Amino acid sequence: MKKIFITILLAALMPFAAGAQDARQRTAETIVADALAQLPAQTPKAFASLMQELAATGADGIRMMAAMLVPAAEGKNAPVEYAINGVVSYVTAAGREELAREIRAGLTDAVAASTDKPNQAFLLSQLQLCATAAEAPVYVTYAAHEYLADTAVRGLIAP
């Protein structure tokens, strides 16, 4: 009788244990891969949800996506650029300052890690959209570079 009671009790508790497994326990790599696979989103609501998930990956997510950028001769960057731009746009909304801080940190790291000048210019332009005065040294670093000077100076004079 005791075995039956324990078996029934365990069987009754199983749904609660399964419910405790939240899909949000995914790794940043999984979130980025899933979001990129779902872009372009079918509705604005779905797009906002994907951008929220990507923004929640913080600096790590931005660095991962930036690492996926390849030189133009080697492939297409449109899906990744679309995702990065969407995240930057998402975090610039009022009340998302903490997310924006993380995204700025990721973009700053990504610019430094990138070796492709057009990709660096893209990342600098995205940083410009969410930058604060604290990011000025990033732009100063690239202001003397022949290819990146225009983008860097635009970042310095942006409001």
Name each region found by the language model:
Residues 1-4:
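Positively charged n-region of N-terminal signal peptides that target proteins for export
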Residues 6-15:
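Bacterial N-terminal signal peptides
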Residues 16-20:
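Sec/Tat signal peptide C-region and signal peptidase I cleavage site
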Residues 22-37, 59-71, 93-111, 121, ...:
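Amphipathic alpha-helical scaffolding segments comprising HEAT/armadillo-like alpha-solenoid repeats
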Residues 28-56:
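Mature N-terminal segment immediately following signal peptide/propeptide cleavage
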Residues 42, 75, 95, 111-115, ...:
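Structural signature of alpha-solenoid helical repeat scaffolds
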Residues 43-47, 62, 76-81, 120, ...:
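Residue-level detector of extended alpha-helical repeat arrays and alpha-solenoid scaffolds
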Residues 53-56, 83-90, 97, 123-129, ...:
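Core register positions within helices of long alpha-helical scaffolds
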